[in-house]
């Protein structure tokens, strides 16, 4: 299902200018936090314009929100929303926007595996459905049809990384939010820590191994005793408060494509090291004149909050499938040497950024500075990094509506 966007209404007028200025200031502030290379003194963002082309949006699925969207935000609790309701319509909800960093991908995948374990146990006795109903309502996608809850795409990714990550003490998260993701995995692994308390007499070990078995048994019993007195080897962490789920909660999965004339103007001051180090700074103006974007977006509405983010290319391909495939033949200038052309994968995010540079002496066609190419590459890389750090899951934006 596709939808039309009134791009002029969103980007035009006073409201559109205010949105453009908000984006400009946001990108400018992010550049001030970046560690610059030695040949760049500063970077300033001067303007941002949405352009005239609108993105193409295709709704892929409507499903339940991700678990991370239910985490309680200490800065904006639910009771504050109730206070806003009582205060009337004086407050402007458009000004209330929160950016939040979720857990890393590994712990999110473990959370999805644990969630599917719970669902598979609850639906194991459902008659007439092979494999149970654990994959029903799992993003409601055709890709998950016929798969059990443990073999859905993200679960397969999580299972491949689960064992090695749990065995690595340096890879375990230390925050309470991340530790909450491990509670199910720890409960499953703990089943193998305690030996059998009453072994079969026919399988009793020989005398030379009996001492080692008794020693291991005593160590296990001491661990159990320590756990009963509150000295469990797994640190107990209070669970992160979660909002109550509601049947009205909804999440939209959409494929977003954009190839337009979005514009942004930046200035980078290049330092000259001749005749001495940092002798003088020359401004280099970079004009981004357009970009090509392909991504999968999540938009969830929970109570009075709207959560928005994009998915990484791997997650996007796992959730909505891949459009990669044969896309015809391409020949050279002579019409020979036909080569197959592959369609790009879905969810590649920022695929191309068009940029023009302006510096003194450009009109004469001479190369003024050899670092111009390096500056362009650095600025474009930072633009990509800012986008991925702020808008790609597990990072997401929350709007109070």
Swiss-Prot record:
InterPro entries: Mdm12 (IPR027532), SMP_LBD (IPR031468). Keywords: Endoplasmic reticulum, Lipid transport, Lipid-binding, Membrane, Mitochondrion, Mitochondrion outer membrane, Transport. The keyword Mitochondrion applies. One of its GO terms (molecular function) is lipid binding. GO terms for biological process: mitochondrial genome maintenance; mitochondrion-endoplasmic reticulum membrane tethering; phospholipid transport; protein insertion into mitochondrial outer membrane. GO terms for cellular component: endoplasmic reticulum membrane; ERMES complex. The keyword Ion transport does not apply. Residues 70-95, 190-247 are annotated as: Disordered. Residues 1-401 form the SMP-LTD domain. Residues 195-205 have a biased composition (Low complexity). It is found in: Mitochondrion outer membrane; Endoplasmic reticulum membrane. Residues 209-220 have a biased composition (Basic and acidic residues). It is a peripheral membrane protein. Its main location: mitochondrion. The SMP-LTD domain is a barrel-like domain that can bind various types of glycerophospholipids in its interior and mediate their transfer between two adjacent bilayers. Component of the ERMES/MDM complex, which serves as a molecular tether to connect the endoplasmic reticulum (ER) and mitochondria. Components of this complex are involved in the control of mitochondrial shape and protein biogenesis, and function in nonvesicular lipid trafficking between the ER and mitochondria. MDM12 is required for the interaction of the ER-resident membrane protein MMM1 and the outer mitochondrial membrane-resident beta-barrel protein MDM10. Belongs to the MDM12 family. PANTHER family: MITOCHONDRIAL DISTRIBUTION AND MORPHOLOGY PROTEIN 12. Component of the ER-mitochondria encounter structure (ERMES) or MDM complex, composed of MMM1, MDM10, MDM12 and MDM34. A MMM1 homodimer associates with one molecule of MDM12 on each side in a pairwise head-to-tail manner, and the SMP-LTD domains of MMM1 and MDM12 generate a continuous hydrophobic tunnel for phospholipid trafficking. This is Mitochondrial distribution and morphology protein 12. It comes from Phaeosphaeria nodorum (strain SN15 / ATCC MYA-4574 / FGSC 10173) (Glume blotch fungus). The lineage of its organism: Eukaryota, Fungi, Dikarya, Ascomycota, Pezizomycotina.
């Amino acid at each position: 299902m596709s939808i039309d966007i009134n791009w002029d209404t969103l980007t035009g007028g006073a409201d559109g200018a205010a949105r453009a200025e908000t984006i400009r200031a946001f990108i400018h502030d992010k550049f001030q936090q970046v560690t610059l290379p030695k040949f760049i003194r500063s970077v300033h963002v001067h303007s941002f314009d949405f352009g005239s082309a609108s993105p193409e949006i295709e709704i892929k699925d409507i499903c339940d929100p991700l678990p991370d969207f239910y985490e309680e935000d200490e800065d904006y609790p639910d009771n504050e929303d109730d206070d806003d309701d009582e205060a009337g319509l004086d407050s402007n909800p458009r000004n209330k926007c929160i950016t939040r960093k979720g857990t890393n991908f590994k712990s999110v995948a473990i959370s999805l595996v644990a969630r599917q374990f719970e669902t598979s146990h609850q639906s194991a006795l459902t008659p007439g459905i092979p494999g149970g109903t654990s994959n029903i309502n799992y993003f409601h996608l055709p890709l998950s049809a016929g798969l059990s809850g443990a073999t859905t795409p993200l679960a397969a990714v999580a299972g491949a990384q689960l064992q090695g990550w749990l065995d690595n003490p340096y890879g375990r998260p230390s925050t309470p939010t991340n530790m909450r993701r491990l509670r199910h995995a720890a409960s499953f692994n703990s089943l193998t820590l305690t030996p059998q308390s009453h072994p079969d007499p026919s399988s009793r070990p020989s005398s030379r191994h009996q001492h080692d078995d008794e020693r291991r048994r005593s160590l296990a019993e001491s661990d159990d005793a320590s756990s009963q007195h509150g000295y469990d080897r797994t640190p107990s962490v209070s669970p992160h408060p979660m909002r109550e789920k509601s049947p009205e909660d909804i999440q939209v999965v959409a494929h977003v494509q954009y190839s337009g004339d979005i514009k942004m103007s930046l200035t980078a001051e290049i330092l000259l090291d001749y005749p001495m180090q940092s002798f003088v700074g020359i401004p280099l103006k970079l004009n981004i004149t357009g970009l090509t974007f392909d991504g999968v977006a999540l938009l969830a509405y929970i109570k009075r909050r709207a959560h928005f983010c994009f998915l990484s290319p791997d997650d996007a391909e796992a959730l909505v499938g891949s459009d990669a495939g044969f896309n015809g033949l391409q020949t050279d200038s002579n019409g020979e040497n036909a080569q197959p052309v592959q369609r790009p994968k879905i969810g590649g995010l920022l695929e191309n950024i068009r940029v023009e540079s302006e510096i003194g002496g450009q009109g004469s066609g001479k190369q003024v500075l050899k670092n111009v190419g390096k500056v362009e590459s650095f600025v474009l890389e930072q633009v990509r990094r800012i986008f991925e750090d702020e808008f790609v899951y597990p990072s997401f934006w929350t709007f109070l509506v």
